[in-house]
From Swiss-Prot:
HAMAP family: UPF0210. CDD domains: RNR_PFL_like_DUF711 (cd08025). InterPro entries: UPF0210. This is UPF0210 protein BLA_0552. Homodimer. It holds the Pfam family DUF711. Belongs to the UPF0210 family.
Amino acid sequence: MLNILEVHETNQMIEQEKLDVRTITMGIDLMDCVSTDLQTTCDLIYNKITSYAKDLVSTGESIERDFGIPIVNKRITVTPIALVGASCCKTSADFVQIAHALDRAAKTVGVDLIGGYSALVSKSMTPAEELLIRSLPAALSETDIVCSSVNVGSTKTGIDMNSVELLGHIIKEIAEATADIDSYGCVKFVAFCNAPDDNPFMAGGFHGVTEGDAVINVGVSGPGVVSRALDAAKGKDFEFLCETIKRTAFKITRVGQLVAQEASKRLGIPFGIIDLSLAPTPAVGDSVGEVLEKIGLAQVGAPGTTAALAMLNDQVKKGGIMASSYVGGLSGAFIPVSEDKNMIDAAESGCLTIEKLEAMTCVCSVGLDMIAIPGDTTASTISGIIADEAAIGMVNQKTTAVRVIPVVGKTVGQMANFGGLMGYAPIMPVNTASCEAFVTRGGRIPAPIHSFKN
C-alpha cells in the first residue's frame, strides 16, 4: 500500500531531481517489407512505420499529462536494414534510399530518432551488409534522425576484424561528410559487441530478429535522483551506500514500469522490457559523474573510479530488477562523456582519459561513448579502439560499444558542440602509436574458450 510520503517523494524526484523517462521506443519488425524491388521495399517500410507508430507521440504526450512524468524522447527501432534490403539493394546508393524512407517515416509520425540502419556482422559480412556499411557516410549525412549500428563481435562468435578495419575508414568518412557540424554524423553511429535485440536507446537501438511484430521498450533516467539520495549517505559505510542506491533504483524503475504498461495498453502493442540504465544529460545535477563523486571521488577518473562505477552499476540492477516484470536492453550506468557535465569537466582537466574510460567500460553499461577525438586520428587507430572495446565485451560476456567522433579540423583542447541531449565535449588525446599491422591482418579473432557452454 502506498503511503503519502512515497507520493510526495516521487513528486519531488520529478520536480526537483530531474527524474524522467528518457524514451518510449517502439520496435517494429520489417521482415514482411522485403521485396526484390527497391521502390516497393521503401514504400512498404514507410507505410508500415507510419501505420504502427502513428499514435506513438500523442500517446507519450497524453501519458505525460495524465501522470505528470516527463517523457523526453519517443523513438522507433526497426529490423536491421542490412537484412531487409538484401534482396533489392545492389549498390550502397540503394541502401541510402532506404535510409531516406526511414527518415521520412520517422518525421511523419513525429518521433525524435529512428534506429536500425544496422548490420550484424559478428562473424563475417555478407555482400549486402558490406554495402550497408559503405553507405553510412552518405546515409548519415543526408538524413537527420536515422541512427545506425554495426555489431562486430560476440562472445559466441568472436570478432570480425574485416568489419572492424573497414569501420575505421567509414567513421573517418562520416566525420568528413558532416565536417561543417562538428562531424555530427558520427554521433548517430555506434559499433557494438554483443548488441542486445531490445535496446531502446540510441544510436544502438534496433529491433532484433528474435522479437515479435511490434513491441514497446522503455528507458528510464535518474542520475539526479540517485545523486540527491546519496546526500544522506555521506560518511556512512558501503552497506548503507548500497542500500540507498538500490532503493532509489527501485523507485526510478517503478516509474518506467508504469509508463511502459500504460503505453502498451493505450497503443495495443505488447510491453517488451525496461532498460534500467542511468542515462545522464549535460544539465547540472543530472550526471552519473556527480554520483561517482558523491560516492567519494574528488573527480571522475581518480583512482577508485572503476570500483565505484562497478558498485553503482550492480546496485542499480539489484534495485531495478525487482521493480519490473521484464528487464533488458543495456541496463546499467551510461558514461557518455559529452552528455555528462561532470565527465566533461573531468575530461577537460585531464583527470579522465580514454584509457581510464576503457577500464570503466569493463564494469558499466556500454562502452566508450560520445568521445570527441582529434580529426587527424588515423582510421587504423579508430579500428584499434573498436577492437579493444569489442574484446572486453567478448571475453567478459557483456555488451560493449564505441561511439567516437573524430572532429574534423579540431585538435586536443578544443571543444566540439553537438547540441541538445548530445551535449558538448573537449577533444581528448588518443595514443598515436600505430596498430595498422594488427588491424589489417584480415579474418576474425576466435571466440574465447569459455564461450563453449554445450
